[in-house]
């Protein structure tokens, strides 16, 4: 399969992951899609993420990731199907990693995979859908050597 992943760093800051790492993570999430695909990963600051989250979800605060699936008119065909955009706020990921005592790279991996899965049609609104999405995320993270982020460790319960 051929994947075209456009990376846009609108933060103006150096990121903890290279463009190659971001591309590999997005490609991993696309692997079972079994079709050529194109998507954009846009990295934004807190101000832009707050604006997007307020505009599209009516929540006036930043979030870690938003996914915007592409919907083209039926009469338009592209050589490589455009899935849409994954928008990530690195500042939010950094804060969440510290708050939850998680590896920054592991958290980036989870959030990027999560966003790409949304473009593929996965969701977590209903419990059954959430379970399927979380199992797939955990499987992909395990391939990268990361623990299942949805399992609570015993020492976290104390």
Curated annotation (Swiss-Prot):
GO terms for cellular component: cytoplasm. Coiled coil: none annotated. One of its GO terms (molecular function) is zinc ion binding. Its main location: cytoplasm. The keyword Lipid metabolism does not apply. It is found in: Cytoplasm. Binds 1 zinc ion. It holds the Pfam family YbeY. The keyword Metal-binding applies. Zn(2+) binds at residues 114, 118, 124. GO terms for biological process: rRNA processing. Its cofactor is Zn(2+). Keywords: Cytoplasm, Endonuclease, Hydrolase, Metal-binding, Nuclease, Ribosome biogenesis, rRNA processing, Zinc. It is an enzyme of class 3 (hydrolase). Its EC number is 3.1.-.-. Single strand-specific metallo-endoribonuclease involved in late-stage 70S ribosome quality control and in maturation of the 3' terminus of the 16S rRNA. Belongs to the endoribonuclease YbeY family. This is Endoribonuclease YbeY. It comes from Legionella pneumophila subsp. pneumophila (strain Philadelphia 1 / ATCC 33152 / DSM 7513). The lineage of its organism: Bacteria, Pseudomonadati, Pseudomonadota, Gammaproteobacteria, Legionellales.
